[in-house]
């Protein structure tokens, strides 16, 4: 996506900060925190440690958009990655931490198509990667298209326990959402066809201009005469007629015609004189 012009700042640090700001916008405001490991990171050099973290206090009931956040991280990165979200019961709060790849020793596999509820006691940890999330979605036979089923974490913090429910939530009106997706796909195809058509037209204009500048006939145009002098436009029909009259035509030289006339006159004069 970098070649398409990502909506992040020009400097690498600004690019990563833009990603963190977007994550802050979609995470509930009651969850505190935001930034993780600091550094001049970019889509081609994402953080190897914690990218962001949020805290939920005791007594809070939050819904964390895990799938949206993980896909946002995956789309931002220009290098292969498998974003991972770790959830920990610290004993006084619940901690959400995001990584571009699962850290060494981090738990995984606790969430399956059959097991979507987890209870964390003090200092216990669980987590889920984007690859495992897609596997669960496929096993459940859910619609994998955007804006359809998306996983959220319902978090209930009641110390010393934290209850987590991993649930897929769909749009309120699935039929209308499918129509929007189909319309968006049709518009994208139409834009692509228009772009290709405009590129073809531009290429034809460039080729014609190149042939015109070199004096050679364009594609599909037969040469009907010598090329026009540089800097002059095509000759008009009346000008072409005048040029035809002005052009020298092949024939005997004038001196030869004069000699022949004199010889013919002398012969006639000799014949008449002989008769007299």
UniProtKB/Swiss-Prot annotation:
| Keyword list, A-Z | Host membrane, Host nucleus, Late protein, Membrane, Phosphoprotein, Transmembrane, Transmembrane helix
Q: Cellular component GO terms, alphabetically?
A: host cell nuclear inner membrane; membrane
| Low complexity: bias regions | 212-225
What spans does the record annotate as topological domain Perinuclear space, numbered to this chain? 1-253
Q: Which residues lie on this side of the membrane: Nuclear?
A: 275-276
Q: According to its UniProt record, where is this protein located?
A: Host nucleus inner membrane
Q: Give the residue spans that cross the bilayer.
A: 254-274
Reported modifications of this chain: Phosphorylated.
Q: How does it sit in the membrane?
A: Single-pass membrane protein
The Gene Ontology biological process terms listed for this entry are: viral budding from nuclear membrane
Its primary localisation, in coarse terms, equals host cell
Give the InterPro entries listed for this entry. Answer: Herpesvirus_viron_egress-type
Q: Which domain of life is it from?
A: Viruses
Stretches the record annotates as Disordered: 212-237
Question: Which family does the UniProt entry place this protein in?
Answer: Belongs to the herpesviridae NEC2 protein family.
Write out the function statement from the record.
Answer: Plays an essential role in virion nuclear egress, the first step of virion release from infected cell. Within the host nucleus, NEC1 interacts with the newly formed capsid through the vertexes and directs it to the inner nuclear membrane by associating with NEC2. Induces the budding of the capsid at the inner nuclear membrane as well as its envelopment into the perinuclear space.
Q: How does it assemble?
A: Forms a heterohexameric complex with NEC1.
Protein name per the record: Nuclear egress protein 2
């Amino acid at each position: 996506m970098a070649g398409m012009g990502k909506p992040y700042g020009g400097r690498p640090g600004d690019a990563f900060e833009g990603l963190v700001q977007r994550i802050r916008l979609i995470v509930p405001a009651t969850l505190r925190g935001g930034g993780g490991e600091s550094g001049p990171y970019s889509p081609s050099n994402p953080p190897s440690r914690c990218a962001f973290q949020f805290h939920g206090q005791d007594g809070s009931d939050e819904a964390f958009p895990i799938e949206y956040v993980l896909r946002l991280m995956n789309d931002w990165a220009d290098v292969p990655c498998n974003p991972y979200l770790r959830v920990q019961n610290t004993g006084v709060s619940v901690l959400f931490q995001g990584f571009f790849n699962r850290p060494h020793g981090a738990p995984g596999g606790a969430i399956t198509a059959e097991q979507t509820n987890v209870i964390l006691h003090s200092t216990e940890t669980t987590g889920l990667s984007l690859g495992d999330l897609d596997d669960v979605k496929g096993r459940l036979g859910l619609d994998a298209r955007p804006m359809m089923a998306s996983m959220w974490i319902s978090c209930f913090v009641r110390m010393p326990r934290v209850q987590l429910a991993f649930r897929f939530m769909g749009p309120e009106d699935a039929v209308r959402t499918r129509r929007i997706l189909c319309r968006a796909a049709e518009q994208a195809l139409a834009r692509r066809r228009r772009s290709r058509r405009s590129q073809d037209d531009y290429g034809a204009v460039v080729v014609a201009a190149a042939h015109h500048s070199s004096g050679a006939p364009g594609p599909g145009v037969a040469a009907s005469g010598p090329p026009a002098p540089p800097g002059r436009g095509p000759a008009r029909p009346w000008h072409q007629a005048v040029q035809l009259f002005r052009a020298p035509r092949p024939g005997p030289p004038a001196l030869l015609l004069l000699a022949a006339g004199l010889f013919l006159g002398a012969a006639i004069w000799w014949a008449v004189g002989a008769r007299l």
